[in-house]
């Protein structure tokens, strides 16, 4: 039964992998709703700056990862599935096996935290783990089938999502084997950065609108 369950999770992960760039859009309506009438402390400049910093930490992680990856690696492919001619083990991949998903987490949470709703942030964090865990399982099954023992040896010493700076084995930085390509980052990431900034502005707009309606109702 366990192998069958793993097979089912892998199958679902492959389906989610193809649509992983679009499925998070289902969070937009509830995030906007939660942002409407947010607690007053969520409007403070310091807290908003913190949320922006969390979001751009995610952008930085993704940029550092993408800027060094060689062509032909497992990456964006929403119609044909996964492609990997090279196994990434250096740069950000020497710290965690899924640095892009770690970056995504910070970008998601930046917008969720900006709503000022702690319970909503907790729910989204749990949904994120359930969502990306299946995608990661499918990706790892694909890479293990492709690269065999080489992949298994690397994966046994590198954590999946959170760098390990204590105990053994401990995450250790291995410099990327190729130079950083800003052009590649801009080509790959401008949509994500635009979506992040647009999300903040939409949340701010809904919050301002909600505050205006509340003030009008008390007149």
What is each stretch, according to the model?
Residues 1-90, 106-219:
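Membrane-anchoring alpha-helices and their flanking helix-loop junctions
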Residues 94-108:
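Conserved SAM-binding loop
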């Amino acid at each position: 039964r366990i192998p069958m369950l793993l097979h089912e999770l892998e199958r679902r992960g492959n389906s989610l992998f193809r649509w992983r760039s679009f499925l998070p859009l289902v969070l937009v309506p509830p995030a906007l709703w939660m942002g409407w009438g947010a607690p007053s402390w969520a409007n403070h400049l310091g807290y908003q700056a913190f949320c922006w910093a969390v979001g751009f930490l995610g952008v930085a992680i993704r940029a550092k990862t993408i800027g060094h990856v060689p062509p032909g690696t497992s990456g964006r492919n929403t119609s044909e599935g996964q492609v990997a001619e090279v196994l990434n083990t250096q740069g950000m991949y020497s710290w965690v096996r899924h640095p892009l998903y770690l970056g995504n987490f910070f970008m998601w949470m930046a917008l969720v935290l900006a709503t000022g709703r702690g319970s909503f942030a907790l729910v989204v964090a749990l949904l994120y783990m359930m969502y990306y865990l299946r995608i990661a399982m499918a990706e790892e099954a694909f890479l293990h089938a492709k690269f065999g023992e080489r992949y298994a040896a690397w994966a046994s010493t590198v954590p999946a999502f959170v760098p390990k700076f204590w105990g053994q084995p401990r995450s250790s930085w291995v410099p990327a084997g190729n130079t950083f390509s800003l052009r590649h980052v801009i080509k790959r990431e401008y949509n994500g950065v635009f979506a992040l900034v647009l999300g903040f502005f939409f949340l701010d707009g809904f919050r301002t609108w909600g505050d205006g309606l509340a003030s009008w109702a008390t007149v």
